[in-house]
């Protein structure tokens, strides 16, 4: 059985309970999401989660990691500039001072630099998509869907106004 633990962040205002206490007890860290699979160690880093998903996927399902090593290197590189330290999502987090921003290294200087870094990643991905389109592909890497496409489609929601039909407002 695989499951992802994604508790609410922060402290419950009514009870004073740390909402991530159980996550820390299980994993010795508080990053989200965290994946659990059977009795194996928890996975909380995107690259480990992707490897686990590939490992436990059914044999006849498409893979998200290319078999071709050059394409694999491209795919992991693009994923890293979106998901990794000092990448798009990282810099989105440190644009504002707050608990999440401070967890990822917020400072006045980092906050000022962050929008430029986000713009660089978006420009890189735009250029890549244009190059791929010229070769007849609508994907970031090669001619099939990869993890880079999935991660970019998901994380691009943090830089666009997402319509409520795609992401309904929550309480």
Task: Label each residue range with its predicted role.
Residues 77, 81-170:
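GST-like fold's C-terminal all-alpha helical module
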Residues 1-4, 167-171:
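Short, intrinsically disordered, charge-balanced linker/junction segments flanking boundaries
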């Amino acid at each position: 059985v695989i499951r992802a633990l994604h508790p609410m962040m922060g402290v419950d205002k009514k009870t004073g309970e740390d909402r991530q206490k159980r996550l820390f007890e299980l994993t010795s860290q508080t990053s989200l999401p965290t994946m659990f699979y059977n009795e194996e160690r928890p996975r909380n880093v995107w690259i480990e989660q992707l490897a686990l998903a590939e490992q436990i996927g059914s044999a006849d399902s498409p893979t998200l990691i290319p078999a071709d090593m050059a394409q694999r290197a491209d795919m992991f590189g693009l994923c890293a500039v979106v998901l990794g330290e000092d990448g798009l999502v990282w810099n989105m987090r440190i644009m504002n001072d707050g608990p999440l921003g401070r967890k990822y290294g917020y400072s006045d200087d980092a906050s000022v630099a962050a929008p430029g870094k986000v713009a660089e990643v978006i420009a890189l991905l735009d250029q890549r998509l244009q190059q791929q389109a010229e070769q007849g592909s609508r994907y970031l890497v090669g001619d099939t869907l990869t993890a880079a496409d999935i991660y970019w489609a998901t994380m691009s929601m943090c830089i666009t106004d997402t319509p409520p039909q795609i992401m309904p407002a929550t309480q």
